[in-house]
Amino acid sequence: MKVEAAPQVDPSSLLAAQKLYEARCAPCHGISGNSDGEKAAQVRPRPQRLSDRMWQLNASNERIRKVIVYGGGAVHKSNVMPASPDLAQQPQLLDGLVAVLRSFLKPQPT
């Protein structure tokens, strides 16, 4: 089983998505997706570890988009994960954010 490839986005959208991740997501998910952001310890259940290989394998890009736009409750996960409905009308930025999340998976050692 392979991790779904990150969406292709232009460099400016990727940069904007990285800044958006740092502002909206990193406080809980951590700067590298390790669920170690400054607010992570206060959140129950703990934020998803986005760098987790099994999560990356099982989460499709479409599901990730859905969680981002509609919140965790939309996929039967924690309602603590807030929705970002503004991103539904910004597909390049949304795809950029998915690409940022995909970048957290590090290659397995050979």
Over which residues does each language-model region extend?
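Sequence context surrounding c-type heme c attachment/ligation sites in exported
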Residues: 15-26, 59, 63, 88
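Conserved functional loop/turn residues at catalytic and ligand-binding sites
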Residues: 24, 32, 54, 72
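The canonical Cys-X-X-Cys-His
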Residues: 17, 21-31, 81, 97-101
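Gly/Gly-Pro-rich "capping" loops immediately C-terminal to redox-active cysteine motifs
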Residues: 18, 34-65
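Electrostatic cytochrome c docking/interface patches
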Residues: 1-20, 110
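Axial heme c-ligation environment in periplasmic c-type cytochrome domains
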Residues: 41-48, 67-97, 101-104
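Flexible gly/pro/ser-rich segments immediately N-terminal to CXXCH heme-c attachment motifs
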Residues: 8-15, 54, 83-89
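Inter-heme linker and motif-flanking segments adjacent to c-type heme-binding CXXCH motifs
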Residues: 34-36, 74, 103-110
